[in-house]
Amino acid sequence: MKPIAGPGGILVVVGMTREAKILGPEAPVLIGGGDAAALATALEAELAAGVAGVVSFGLCGALDSSLKVGDLVIGEVVLDGIDRLPTDPAWTERLAAALPGARRGGFASSGRPVASVADKAALLAATGALAVDMESHLVARLARAHRAPFAVVRGVSDGARRALPHAAQVGLAADGRPAIGPVLASLRSNPFQIGALIRTALEAEDGFQALERARRALGHRLAGPGRVDALVDHLAADPAAIVSADHALGEAQPTVLQDTRGPPLARPGA
């Protein structure tokens, strides 16, 4: 399958189609949905093809009680088990400069929704992270393996002291679209959660609005590195490539432009 980002492109990883729509049609986006294995496979292929950077973008749950619904959080480090995976420092600084009201800190990883207040408190105690989401650890782990810069920008949709009802936990399909059937089935089994579900949806809207503000402030590349930045990072990571790059640049400056249809064409002004 042809890469959607390609060399020089900024790849965005989200969990839901709603998050992808905020980015607009020009953004190369992978939608994780509830299928972590499929997301990892697709992300691995994109990174192997080469990208300028990858960013985890979408909603998150607060672990720190000082975070409010609708706050933006910029990741400085992703905590994946015992691993601490720092985001790209320069990219993180650009994000912070463009989003002056955003909080900065760590993101915890989870392969499932962290729904109860007790679970959020336990994860905070174990990691010290500000927030949690379900995609950033995959982005961080695979980006590091491919020496690609990565960043995290997320909007808070549920507070540290807010529990998610069961209907909200089953509301995401594997393709990132709303899973209406499981939500209705959950409501039939426990109709008393309807109030909590409505509240969860309203608070999620605050998170989506925060993401829309971030998208407008950051532009379609989400403040990511450009082609030149990516080349510099690549050469810094692999000094031996400098010789190859210098050789390639030298060969790319001929004194004569060769026309394959006839004799050489002199360079204008020669």
Predicted regions and their residues:
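Glycine-rich phosphate- or other oxyanion-binding loops that anchor nucleotides, phosphorylated ligands
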Residues: 7-270
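Short boundary motifs at domain starts and secondary-structure transition points
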Residues: 1-5
